[in-house]
From Swiss-Prot:
InterPro entries: Chorismate_synth, Chorismate_synth_AroC_sf, Chorismate_synthase_CS. Reduced FMN (FMNH(2)). It comes from the Bacteria. This is Chorismate synthase.
Length: 367
């Protein structure tokens, strides 16, 4: 299977299946000397692991990371960093029935169409557990970005019809909400909405917003490797994502040029600033120094107990109700996955951008 790697300089390759012995990732291209330990990575993994709230799958996994290589005495060595997380509570028997039919909304049919074979146990490689490797790698990228004063903040913007405004939220409330929704009043309304979904044997989708601050102007490559194009690729590679927009996004189709253009000015300290941020912090595929803001639309969990129509391998039309342990909503656990992919994208482009000016090269190599 191709397509399991991401990045050009700061590169990752994930491996493993939902019900295999473990999930892992290899990170290549991380500079030597970055402070790193398993606890730092575990903090990220704990944000996505299952079974922590009533709104995530009851499958209990500790998701404990083991660093196998690339770190010595708390510092990265510059060699590939290999990490593994064991699958400890897989219940493959829950999935034996689905070997004979295609689950609506899943990749069962398309994997069969491409490979003529599929691992039906929890979706195999197409399972959401694949994102564990991304999150572990993203923790390393986030540590690198932190050294440069760059912060990636990601949260649940909406669940079903319940939507919040970032500017009216308090970041510290993020960990107080089981849904990663920093507006606690809205979070409670979203919980009530999810209770209705569960009662109706259904699931819900939602939206995740990411705000990246501290990115200097000049990051990203024009034409095919634009910063916004790379972010879109990264976020769309997450299985549950079905939509992506940056800045004002699809609203720009309704705006006039005079409304959409972001004016420039100098602040009291003589620093160039933008008066608005409809562009989402990117112009011409290159960061402009303001906050990078994007949103990802997450589809409802496809595994639901409500009866749905499908077909089996005997050529029959059938009705199915999906059994097993599944999230009524993917969004809260996907928040850190989106954050990880954003961090990986920025880390890769920052490192590749070091050769864009002769001044940068001289700072490193001139004697």
């Amino acid at each position: 299977m191709s397509g399991s790697s991401f990045g050009s300089i700061f590169k990752i390759a994930t491996w493993g299946e939902s019900h295999g012995k473990g999930i892992g990732v290899v990170v290549d291209g991380c500079p030597a000397g970055l402070t790193l330990n398993e606890e730092m990575i575990q903090t990220f993994l704990n944000r996505r692991k299952p079974g922590q709230t009533k709104y995530s799958t009851p499958r209990k996994e500790d998701d404990l990371v083991t660093i196998l290589s690339g770190v010595f005495e708390g510092k990265t060595t510059g060699t590939p960093i290999s990490m593994m997380i064991a699958n400890e509570t897989a219940r493959s028997a829950d999935y034996s029935e689905i070997a004979s039919f295609y689950r609506p909304g899943h990749a069962d049919y398309t994997f069969d169409a491409k490979y003529g074979f599929r691992d039906y146990r929890g979706g195999g490689r197409s399972s959401g557990r694949e994102t564990i490797g991304r999150v572990a790698a993203g923790a390393i990228a986030a540590a690198l970005l932190k050294e440069l004063g760059i912060e990636v903040f990601t949260y649940t913007k909406s669940i079903g019809p319940i939507q919040i405004d970032y500017h009216k939220c308090q970041k510290e409330n993020l960990t107080l909400s089981p849904l990663c929704m920093p507006d606690l009043e809205a979070s409670q309304k979203a919980e009530d909405y999810l209770e209705q979904c569960i009662h109706n044997l259904d699931s819900s989708g939602g939206m995740i917003e990411c705000i990246i601050s501290g990115v200097p102007a000049g990051i990203g490559e024009p034409v095919f490797d634009k910063l916004d194009a790379q972010l879109a690729k990264a976020i769309f590679s997450i299985g549950a994502v079905k939509g992506f927009e940056i800045g004002s996004g699809f609203e720009v189709a309704k705006q006039l040029g005079s409304e959409n253009n972001d004016g420039f000015a100098f602040d009291a300290n003589g620093k160039l600033i933008k008066l608005t941020n409809h562009s989402g912090g990117i112009l011409g595929g290159i960061s402009d120094g303001s906050e990078i803001i994007f949103r990802a639309a997450i589809k409802p969990t496809p595994s639901i107990k409500k009866e749905q129509q499908t077909v089996n391998k005997s050529g029959e039309n059938i009705n199915v109700s999906i059994k097993g342990r599944h999230d009524p909503i993917i969004v809260p656990r996907a928040v850190v996955v989106v954050e990880a992919m954003a961090a990986l994208t920025l880390a890769d482009l920052l490192l590749s951008g070091m050769s864009s000016k002769m001044d940068y090269v001289k700072k490193i190599y001139q004697k």
